[in-house]
UniProtKB/Swiss-Prot annotation:
Top-level taxon: Eukaryota
Function description: Adapter protein implicated in the regulation of a large spectrum of both general and specialized signaling pathways. Binds to a large number of partners, usually by recognition of a phosphoserine or phosphothreonine motif. Binding generally results in the modulation of the activity of the binding partner. Promotes cytosolic retention and inactivation of TFEB transcription factor by binding to phosphorylated TFEB. Induces ARHGEF7 activity on RAC1 as well as lamellipodia and membrane ruffle formation. In neurons, regulates spine maturation through the modulation of ARHGEF7 activity.
Subunit description: Homodimer. Heterodimerizes with YWHAE. Homo- and heterodimerization is inhibited by phosphorylation on Ser-58. Interacts with FOXO4, NOXA1, SSH1 and ARHGEF2. Interacts with CDK16 and with WEE1 (C-terminal). Interacts with MLF1 (phosphorylated form); the interaction retains it in the cytoplasm. Interacts with BSPRY. Interacts with Thr-phosphorylated ITGB2. Interacts with Pseudomonas aeruginosa exoS (unphosphorylated form). Interacts with BAX; the interaction occurs in the cytoplasm. Under stress conditions, MAPK8-mediated phosphorylation releases BAX to mitochondria.
Taxonomic lineage: Eukaryota, Metazoa, Chordata, Craniata, Vertebrata
Organism: Mus musculus (Mouse)
Signal peptide (residue range): none
Modified residues annotated as N6-acetyllysine in this record: 3, 68
Record protein name field: 14-3-3 protein zeta/delta
Amino acid sequence: MDKNELVQKAKLAEQAERYDDMAACMKSVTEQGAELSNEERNLLSVAYKNVVGARRSSWRVVSSIEQKTEGAEKKQQMAREYREKIETELRDICNDVLSLLEKFLIPNASQPESKVFYLKMKGDYYRYLAEVAAGDDKKGIVDQSQQAYQEAFEISKKEMQPTHPIRLGLALNFSVFYYEILNSPEKACSLAKTAFDEAIAELDTLSEESYKDSTLIMQLLRDNLTLWTSDTQGDEAEAGEGGEN
């Protein structure tokens, strides 16, 4: 199938909410080796975000059931095996995306904006791996995530307006990484607050086409800050989960 047909099919799959098909189409487009247009880049991102999102959500539900069935040996074993099956799917999806990023997307990114977008994506998918990692593996995965976010963060500060939706989305997800993966609420709050304040200070630089995206992410940054600064014990597990880009 040629590139245009694959992109058309991906859009059709998106409308049908068949995200596995959508991801497969955009994976094929990426493997053709040319740099993706903004539209193609967004299709790829939306497809995999939905594909991995379904597994992350299932994993959280089954993990919680597994913890609650302590003492009921049979039920707990069934939940554990099911969680492990979901984990395998989740890892395969993340490794798929990370391999596309390493082989094609990051090396081919000619603009700072694309580079930041793909490095953020790399940080995100290592973060999803970190959520289900245990033991010796975990530290290496967490480091990979942090390095990708950090590199993206430095480029974004140098090359993009504080109101740019990609720069804001990166700050949002990097702060969630600090809060949830590194358990550093102070660092998470400081990063989110700085990003929010810098964007507010330059609201007049907001372009018409990104106005909606930017203000939505600013709202998410503020929601997370509210949640994290109250930091009540009961909110711990959920904090930041709604607030991701």
